[in-house]
Design a protein with these regions (language model features):
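Amphipathic alpha-helical interface elements
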Residues: 1-182
Length: 182
């Protein structure tokens, strides 16, 4: 089953933040804390992407933090106030996960993912091409076993590719040796 954020991989314009969104979803079952941190990172990258393409927003400096970006420069007025307020949950969960010893529950991490998904949906609706409405589905979050199976399959594919390339190189070298001996 395709993950919630998988559609981002098909949209090159979202390359800046798509990987972070996918990572946040992929790691949830293994580590809700790391998922919350990754959700916060994905949010920050997505917000910076908006600043880079929306001419209504003034360019940002390299030292602008996420809270400054969320609160300044007319950013809150771009979207529904309810969505904007919900973004604080992602920031709070991510910051607490990094800076405190507070245990983050799976439910809180899922909520962060859900809010991130809603925000990315809003971004796609406002700034994307070929928008298709999507709904967050918790059942699409890969479990640890599924994630391990994906990693194992990717590993097998890499081994196949290496072997194929090695065989190709050996064949090319054999032909070169034959040519030199002839």
């Amino acid at each position: 089953m395709e993950m919630n954020f998988a559609f981002l991989e098909k949209k090159q314009e979202y390359e800046l933040f798509s990987g972070a969104c996918i990572d946040a979803e992929r790691i949830l079952e293994s580590s809700p804390v790391m998922s919350a941190v990754a959700s916060r990172k994905a949010l920050e990258l997505c917000v910076k992407w908006i600043y880079s393409i929306d001419s209504a927003l003034e360019p940002i400096g390299n030292r602008e933090g996420l809270q400054s970006l969320l609160h300044n420069n007319g950013f809150p007025s771009l979207m529904d106030i309810t969505l904007w307020r919900r973004l604080q949950h992602i920031v709070r969960n991510g910051n607490e996960s990094v800076h405190t010893s507070k245990r983050l529950t799976r439910d809180n991490a899922v909520l962060s993912l859900n809010i991130l998904f809603d925000f990315v949906e809003w971004v796609d609706y406002c700034y994307g091409r070929d928008y298709v409405e999507r709904v967050f589905d918790e059942k699409k979050i890969p479990d640890a076993t599924t994630d391990m199976n994906v990693v194992q399959e990717e590993y097998r594919q890499v081994i196949k590719d290496v072997q194929k390339n090695a065989d190709k190189i050996v064949n090319e070298k054999d032909k070169e040796i034959e040519r030199l001996l002839a």
